Swiss-Prot record:
SUPFAM superfamilies: Cna protein B-type domain (SSF49478). PROSITE patterns: GRAM_POS_ANCHORING. It is found in: Secreted, Cell wall. Residues 1-22 form the signal peptide. This is Trypsin-resistant surface T6 protein. It is a peptidoglycan-anchor.
Amino acid sequence: MLACLAILAVVGLGMTRVSALSKDDTAQLKITNIEGGPTVTLYKIGEGVYNTNGDSFINFKYAEGVSLTETGPTSQEITTIANGINTGKIKPFSTENVSISNGTATYNARGASVYIALLTGATDGRTYNPILLAASYNGEGNLVTKNIDSKSNYLYGQTSVAKSSLPSITKKVTGTIDDVNKKTTSLGSVLSYSLTFELPSYTKEAVNKTVYVSDNMSEGLTFNFNSLTVEWKGKMANITEDGSVMVENTKIGIAKEVNNGFNLSFIYDSLESISPNISYKAVVNNKAIVGEEGNPNKAEFFYSNNPTKGNTYDNLDKKPDKGNGITSKEDSKIVYTYQIAFRKVDSVSKTPLIGAIFGVYDTSNKLIDIVTTNKNGYAISTQVSSGKYKIKELKAPKGYSLNTETYEITANWVTATVKTSANSKSTTYTSDKNKATDNSEQVGWLKNGIFYSIDSRPTGNDVKEAYIESTKALTDGTTFSKSNEGSGTVLLETDIPNTKLGELPSTGSIGTYLFKAIGSAAMIGAIGIYIVKRRKA
């Protein structure tokens, strides 16, 4: 009876009374505050032993392999039993699936009995640790039990461990410009990402303590592994050459650069239930997708939603698959890029002009790009984000005079209403100013062959000034078509004209014709004066 009362002290509350002492006595076992709709399975690991008449309780008989401190079953013991059930080392007396109603799983136990409840497969990714339930007699000979709150902590052993937890991941990005609730950026810009977590709650004896983070950049973003930092307990970790994540003398994980991103496996027991924070950077490259599709970047957080099944996953070469006790949460951020386009034509015939070279400038008159018109007269600059820009002709097409007018264009979600078959152009950068196109000024920075915009100078001593050495014009078949907002390309509303050398610009206005008439009269007068002087001579 004392053993029965001890287990009751652990699980007995919300008493359910019965009038007789019998192996046919019943009591309701309840688990409350269940969320996520998991599958609830009860494994009977202990059953009451009664006398031959069945009217006197003697003690509990446990399944082979079960070790339980009846005066205070610990979280470690409960987890070890659950591990044994999952591996087949412990054979329960019976197994029951229990339905959930209004967040409560209810089971009518017959006779004194002890169960391990495993809650698995929650649709919201919730992790449930094993729960001990018991129907036991009190001092008055009544079969009683306790309603167990699935969100409560263990009473014995690791009392800081909750019976359930809801892991999560939150991703943020900075270094962008907000435009109609969109995060926008431009080629060469540096983006800073941060990850924060809500860790799962595992017991010490759990066999699957996976805490694994994976992030792989999309093609338009270049990941910088050297920028990866981990902060834990207010201290910055040191990531060693072999990838070990060290905080002072404590190894809390190991990281590895994989493709265009990283995999990072944390050591759960070393984290002391304190979540780490991760940050890293990426550079927008010339493969960035323009327009409403954007450039997504997804971070995945893998963990165990069944800590007593499978094993801790720590293979850095390949992120884990879901299943066998592992699930994941993810958070994505999308950054959007724009491009501006314009068309170069003959001022009279409106024929497209090839080979005109233009500079693109920001509002502070800093050169950010150099572009060349193609056979169809079009040129595109992909090095713009949301904002205003200026277009100036640097070199006229062969046989034409230079257009000295400055054209302004605004790039944003509303004005980007054109779709084009060209998403980028090829630009070659150099750190040698003597090789710069038309002796053009600096447009950014180069480090390890990666281009950074003028306002995104990277750290380190191996950073060099970047100049545009050459640009490849758009293909002749490039198309432009009117579309909806957010299509990515802003097309200058007016064509940019050029006048042939030896021709005067004509707009058809009366002022132009008057100018021509005065010029003609002056020429005739000059010829007359010349003839008179010749005769006098």
